[in-house]
């Protein structure tokens, strides 16, 4: 992460801020700050003066991934589409993945400070930052490293954790005081398992074991990007991250669990999952822009903390988009769907996903050049059947032709209004796979959303489906527009 931040600073995209901001529960200013900075496509910030923080002297990293360009920079690109194609290409070709490299613990920055056993006290040693109306503070910067308890297959996933210091109980109760010192509630959907960490947790539970986990915070952004991608089960996201960054990720063995973590992480927490201890947590601001009032999650008991001598803490929240990690969450969604579709359908040119998770698939052909009638609907079904974790959860998918910019929603709307008939050119699915936090779906506190309607819109030209010809588009030639711009230089 520090190399990435240095690149941002050199580029003028990282600012050090000494102005005080309130980070306390109930009075915090950070949701408003997030809204203000992200709505302006503002820079990354290092906040050096957050009032109410329980760990003095720890700077708070804010908004590092807040634009498409900065997210592209995490894997060495400036252009968003080039970064997406790079992600899709590496994901689709595991021969380009680079296995992680194990390094000597003595040289690992994440082990400059080691705290074990009775010395562990999360309420004193880990920053707690509140956003909006959230009841607890949440760890939002961390990846979970785990192994399949049966096969040993590795997994890295980006999950949230509830901290218990000064946390309000969503049902009006109280948490045991020791929770604040050693425990976190983990956003692991494990029963039934809706993720790889869920599978690992569920397997360990069935085997009568406690799953070992290592939670690494503020790491190489390429690893954060990889951990948000749906790679094949039991594949190593750290190797995928190596392929994305062009060199192996340096890893180091943990102190108290049989796992490896990134050697350059700012923080590492080692512990075990207690599926027999569940806690209701809330409020939590989710990525679709609503507060979850109550959710039930298992406890992770921490037995070791390691960190850099002068660590950085990354704090963010989810809310109505845009927000800080919107785009680093969207790039893997777009990349994994594009990677899968291009293997099966060469006419797929691009996949764009909006911050609100509307999918737009751009084809390289349209009209009479389409391979067969109803080709747009064929593509819609392919999105819902795509490999990875995201395509199957697409609530709204729109297919457009090559003359429609999938990133320009005005153009997408134009294609819909002039090429789409709602009854004839749509697919409605009543039993689709949901985005797990969608508040409009059937949902439970423990299982999340479990069923969603889905809609697909074929906004391609309906040749040969209904017509043999279509009116010519009335559109200015781009070269002519550029010539006019030069002609009016200094006037407009």
Annotate each PLM feature.
Residues 1-492:
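Extended, highly charged
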């Amino acid at each position: 992460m520090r190399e990435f931040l240095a690149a941002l600073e050199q580029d003028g995209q990282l600012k050090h801020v000494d102005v005080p901001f309130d980070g306390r529960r109930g009075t915090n200013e950070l949701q408003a700050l997030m809204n203000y900075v992200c709505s302006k496509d503002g820079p990354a910030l290092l906040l050096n003066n957050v009032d109410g923080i329980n760990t003095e002297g720890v700077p708070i990293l804010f908004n590092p991934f807040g634009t498409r360009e900065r997210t592209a920079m995490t894997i060495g690109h400036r252009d968003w589409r080039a970064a997406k194609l790079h992600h899709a290409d590496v994901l689709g070709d595991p021969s380009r993945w680079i296995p992680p490299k194990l390094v000597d613990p003595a040289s690992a920055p994440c082990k400059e400070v080691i705290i074990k056993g009775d010395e562990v006290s999360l309420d004193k040693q880990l920053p707690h930052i509140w956003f909006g109306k959230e009841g607890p503070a949440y760890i939002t910067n961390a990846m979970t490293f785990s192994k399949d308890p049966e096969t040993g297959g590795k997994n890295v996933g980006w999950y949230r954790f509830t901290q218990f210091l000064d946390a309000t109980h969503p049902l009006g109760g109280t948490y045991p005081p020791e929770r604040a010192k050693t425990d976190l509630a983990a956003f692991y959907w494990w029963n039934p398992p809706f993720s790889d960490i869920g599978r690992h947790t569920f397997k360990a539970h069935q085997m009568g074991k406690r799953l070992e986990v290592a939670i690494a915070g503020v790491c190489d952004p390429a690893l954060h990007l990889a951990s948000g991608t749906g790679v094949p089960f039991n594949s190593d996201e750290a190797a995928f991250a190596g392929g994305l960054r062009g060199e192996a990720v340096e890893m180091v063995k943990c102190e108290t669990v049989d796992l490896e973590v990134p050697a350059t992480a700012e923080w590492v927490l080692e512990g075990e999952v207690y599926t027999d201890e569940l806690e209701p947590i809330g409020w939590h601001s989710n990525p679709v822009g609503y507060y979850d009032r109550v959710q039930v999650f298992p406890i992770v008991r921490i037995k070791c903390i390691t960190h850099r001598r002068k660590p950085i803490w990354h704090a963010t929240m989810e809310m109505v988009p845009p927000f800080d990690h919107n785009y680093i969450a969207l790039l893997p969604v777009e990349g994994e769907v594009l990677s899968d579709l291009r293997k099966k359908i060469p006419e797929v040119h691009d996949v764009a996903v909006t911050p609100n998770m509307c999918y737009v698939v751009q084809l390289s052909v349209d009209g009479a050049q389409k391979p067969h009638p109803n080709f747009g609907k064929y593509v819609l079904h392919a999105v819902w059947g795509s490999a990875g974790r995201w395509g199957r959860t697409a609530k709204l998918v729109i297919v457009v032709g090559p003359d429609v910019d999938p990133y320009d929603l005005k153009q997408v709307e134009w294609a819909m209004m002039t090429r789409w008939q709602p009854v004839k050119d749509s697919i409605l699915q009543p039993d689709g796979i949901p985005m797990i936090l969608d508040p409009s779906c059937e949902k439970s506190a423990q299982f999340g959303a479990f069923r969603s309607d889905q809609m697909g819109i074929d906004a391609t030209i309906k040749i040969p489906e209904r017509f043999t010809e279509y009116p010519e588009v009335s559109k200015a030639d781009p070269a002519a527009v550029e010539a006019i711009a030069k002609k009016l230089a200094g006037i407009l």
